[in-house]
């Protein structure tokens, strides 16, 4: 009699503790909160774009830019982010660009203030390559709108708008573009840029580069179902790019209008497991239970950095995140409001200007840092 077999996969988990040197977790958490608040402010005054995904990406984005290369972060100079030998960052989940816009503004403002206060040119960034807080005004605005918005509203000489005189207001489309600071190339919509990241890693290997530069790409689980992502799985292994390629997956099981596992993929298909999809292709897969926890993120980055360079498997970190994450939330609640808006319901920015939910988010920031936003409690503004 002929024999026909069925096949199932079983995962083998090798958990180990990672010893971390002293690092300033509070500083990273503070930058994450400022970044999250900035991206939500952009959405509030534009009522468009994306909300939950960028928030979920925040700890990944902050850690990659600020923990330094010894802990597995990027080697780069914010003042000259396009230096050819910098590590390469790619926000492959392009619609999550508000988190990078926000962080780059925070970093840009820090250097700007330092330069203004000291006059020391070591703090002077190339403003044509970097972002400043004034660029918030350029979020999802046309070129003409950016050029005239201040003069039409009598704000050209307002003290808060003086940065516009440096090089104008930059347009921020809402998706990662090739001109964006550390983002290496235009990643396009979700599911496309991840293949470009693998190609970048292959390029540096082909020309005989050392372990540097490394290629770091951030993407979500829904986009990893794309055809480009399947090609990435095979080509990165075939090209043996090793630890040069480090993919950071934000796994929150939430897309635009449904869950992936349990929604698009019905729950009875229990062999559909994200981690298995990468281990079965030969990747070196790392996981953490909470990639919105900075200590876990830094530990994973350090573990990837410490991997033997002779191991030529490309690396991916599958970290569970919360779509709609908020650093001021308490047990799934936003103080002063109620249930936190998470999962696919948080995907678009659909809140009215100065809505109750936005005001509640802002109040957690105010309470944490002892500040007060102007006008948030006065309802929607009636002009620009």
Located regions from the model:
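Generic structural signal for hydrophobic core residues of well-folded globular domains
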Residues: 43, 64, 68, 104-108, ...
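Gly/serine-rich nucleotide phosphate-binding loop at the start of the catalytic core
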Residues: 51
């Amino acid at each position: 009699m002929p024999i026909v077999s069925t096949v199932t996969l079983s995962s083998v988990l090798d958990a180990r503790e990672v010893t971390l040197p002293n690092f300033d977790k509070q500083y990273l958490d503070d930058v994450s909160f400022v970044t999250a608040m900035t991206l939500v402010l952009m959405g509030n005054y534009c009522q468009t774009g994306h909300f939950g995904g960028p928030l979920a990406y925040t700890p990944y984005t902050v850690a990659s830019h600020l923990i330094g290369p010894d802990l597995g972060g990027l080697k780069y100079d914010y003042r000259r982010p396009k230096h050819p030998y910098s590590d390469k960052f790619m926000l492959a989940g392009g619609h999550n660009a508000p988190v990078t816009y926000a962080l780059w503004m925070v970093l840009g403002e820090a250097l700007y203030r330092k330069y203004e206060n000291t006059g020391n040119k070591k703090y002077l960034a190339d403003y044509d390559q970097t972002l400043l807080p004034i660029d918030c005004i350029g979020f999802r605005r046309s070129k003409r709108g950016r050029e005239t918005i201040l003069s039409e509203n009598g704000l050209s000489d307002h003290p808060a708008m003086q940065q516009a005189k440096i090089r104008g207001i930059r347009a921020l489309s809402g998706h990662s573009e090739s001109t964006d600071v550390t983002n290496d190339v235009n990643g396009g919509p979700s599911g496309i840029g991840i293949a470009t990241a693998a190609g970048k890693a292959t390029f540096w290997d082909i020309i005989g580069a050392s372990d540097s530069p490394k290629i770091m790409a951030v993407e979500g689980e829904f986009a990893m179902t794309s055809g480009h992502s399947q090609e990435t799985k095979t080509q990165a292994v075939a090209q043996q790019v090793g630890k040069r390629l480090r993919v950071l997956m934000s796994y929150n099981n939430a897309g635009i209008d449904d869950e992936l596992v349990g929604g698009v993929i019905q729950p009875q298909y229990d062999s559909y497991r994200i981690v298995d999809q990468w281990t079965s292709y030969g990747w070196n897969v790392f996981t953490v239970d909470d990639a919105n926890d900075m200590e876990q993120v830094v530990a994973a980055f350090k573990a990837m950095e410490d991997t033997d360079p002779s191991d030529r498997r490309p690396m991916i970190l599958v970290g569970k995140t919360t779509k709609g994450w908020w650093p001021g939330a308490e047990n799934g609640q936003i103080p002063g409001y109620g249930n936190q808006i998470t999962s696919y319901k948080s995907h678009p920015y659909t809140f009215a200007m100065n809505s109750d939910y936005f005001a509640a988010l802002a109040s957690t920031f105010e309470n944490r840092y002892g500040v007060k936003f102007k006008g948030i409690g006065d309802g929607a503004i009636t002009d620009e």
